[in-house]
Amino acid sequence: MTSASTNDSLPSRLNSDPQREQLMAQVAKLYYDLERTQGDIAKETGLTRWQVARLLREAREVGIVRIEIIPRSPRLPHLEAEMQRRFGLREAIVLASSGDEDVELNVVTQAAGRYLAGLQPPPQLVGVSWGRTMIKMAQWLPPRWNDGVHVVLLNGAINIRNVAEQTNNVAERFAHAGNGHATLLPVPAMLGSERTREALEQDHIVADVLRIADEAPVACFSMGELSERSVLVESGYVDAAIMRDLEKRGAVGDILGRFVDESGEIVAPELDSRTIGLRPERLRDKAFSIGVCVGESKHRVARACLRARYINVLATDEATARFLLEHGDE
């Protein structure tokens, strides 16, 4: 069969998806494993170079080929082992510090994404919180990381202020990457009154979401810093004055939108009574409660999380791990 006849018989889109995926795999093996050029592959298969390039691109898009960028910052097994021993963790994921917090956020969230995607057996139900760190983690999840996964949002996440960076569509992103579906909590994280929260929790739709969040065997979340950079400030739930008052009252950050002190205890009952979503103490019942945090601004809230045993898996940077090991008992 000549190249011309093969090209003429090959439609621009094969009718059979399995047939096309088999061709993607064949071309990808030649290109990546056997290191053939696209020109050589075109001659060998009877395709055009344009068709070869398109098949390689589609192979990456559907997950047949996965290109993983290995960060220069390696995991630090000696610190990980010490963290596990000291704090009774199922797993510690510690990445070398680079001095650049943006770089560290990338490598830590990438490692956390690999850990979540590698859980065996793959969890069918995963709970996630919202925020910048979780958005970043979702970006690193491999395509089809958990085919058909059900992702539920752990806390309310409707922004009451229009912000440039959308941090509240985390569940959809986790689910999309896993070819699954998301269940959202379509209410603000913090309501105007305790009575409003109680009324919403009686609504059968909201109650069902809260039940699913409680039943999820895996929870993945980031601790929030106590500063004007907090997503709770940027989203309009609290202002800088409230943050300063919380600091005076002993708050070190937030967990699932609830402000806690050095021991992980709720600091502001008047705010907590208006907050909707999974309570931090319910994290202790999860098979995998995965906390992800990077940077000095989250040192104290990470320590609070460990003290209260809200997490049994921690993904973080080297500097944070060393702080926790040196000051965990203070």
Language model features with spans:
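Glycine-rich beta-strand-to-loop/alpha-helix junction loops that act as flexible
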Residues: 128-133, 294
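HTH-adjacent hinge/linker in prokaryotic transcriptional regulators
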Residues: 11-18, 50, 55-127, 138-148, ...
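A generic alpha-helix surface/boundary motif
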Residues: 35-36, 77, 110, 132
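Structural beta-sheet core signal
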Residues: 128, 151-153, 184, 291
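Short, hydrophobic/glycine-enriched beta-strand segments
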Residues: 127-128, 218
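Short Gly/Thr/Asp-enriched flexible loops that form oxyanion-binding sites at enzyme active sites
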Residues: 133-144, 231-241
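Conserved beta-strand termini and adjacent loop/short-helix elements that scaffold enzyme active sites
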Residues: 94-97, 154, 185-187
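Conserved phosphate- and dinucleotide-binding cores of soluble alpha/beta proteins
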Residues: 2-28, 32-41, 46, 51-57, ...
